[in-house]
Amino acid sequence: METTLILGSNSFSGATFADFVLALGGHVVGTSRSAEPNNAFLPYKWHDNKNFTFHELDLNKHLKELMELIQDIKPAYVVNFAAQSMVGESWQNPSDWFMTNAVSTIKFHDELRKYDSLKRYVHVSTPEVYGSCSGFVGENFAFNPSTPYAVSRATADMSLRTFYTAYNFPVVTTRAANVYGPGQQLYRIIPRTILFILLGRKLQLHGGGVSTRSFIHMKDVCDATWKVMTDGNNGETYHISTDEVISIRSLVERICLKLNVAFDDHVEFVGDRIGKDSAYHLDSKKIRAKLGWEDKTSLEQGLDECISWVKSNFEILKQQPFDYQHKP
């Protein structure tokens, strides 16, 4: 099978997609700006995968080395999960978010477009570019970003539109909301809630937890990403989401119920974060109709898997940072 290059392979999404491709018999090369983290956060390390190699490369500092790697391994597919994430924190050092998500990413695109052997470039974007919305949002919905993070991501997205038009660059874009699953970073709501309950710590619930989201298991996102990568149409965007909508409070209540604890004993309410979108729900009819994709993992099943993962790795996880660690 052809080689797939995954940028941001240390990320939850990137590591899980690497594991997905390897399970299909593919060859995967991963890059991230930091050394590989603990194996508990790397699903591709949970199986005997021999077709994965890792290179520590920073998109902001090692563009030349990254392009040399591409020329050496000649991947048919490049999937980019690499980005400065964390919406709230982007207000504190916005230039860092713009450097990674806009400037360095666009520089990479400008080099990658000159690579002749590329079959498909998958740009993993975010629904944050739409801002707060009512109802279900389709792929052609206008951008209305409300945070530095969202603006930085929208910048690269719009740049890619011009690259497709001007150069026929073989790009497809995905937006998924909201991903979760075993191996996710501990500052995300689901693993954080589970871990804090098991540790007897109080979870801070911003804005009372009234904001609503859809949660989709990363296994389903991997399946969708694979279909987009292999069968999608260049220049198009595909939304990956479920139709189930739940408030953050209800999500935490559901986890408390599964762990047999009282919600009020483990939660404290704090003010909302600046620029936080109250809701964005993605319409995924397109990928279902055009590529035959469907989500298969219910939230109930997915939460059980996450609880099992936290319990199985509890001694390791309780020693890890619980909060996002910013790195310029």
Feature map (PLM): residue ranges:
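Hydrophobic alpha-helix immediately C-terminal to the catalytic Tyr-X-X-X-Lys motif of short-chain
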Residues: 155, 159-163, 193, 251, ...
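N-terminal Rossmann-like NAD(P)+-binding domain of SDR-like oxidoreductases, especially those catalyzing
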Residues: 1-179, 305, 313, 322, ...
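Proline-centered turn/helix-capping motifs that create local helix->coil transitions or kinks
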Residues: 122, 132-134, 168, 184, ...
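Active-site loop immediately N-terminal to the catalytic Tyr-X3-Lys motif
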Residues: 94, 174, 186-187, 232
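A glycine/serine/threonine-rich, flexible loop-to-helix segment
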Residues: 186-194
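CheY-like receiver
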Residues: 65-73, 111, 196, 224, ...
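C-terminal substrate-binding subdomain of Rossmann-fold SDR/epimerase-dehydratase oxidoreductases
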Residues: 18, 23, 30-31, 197-328
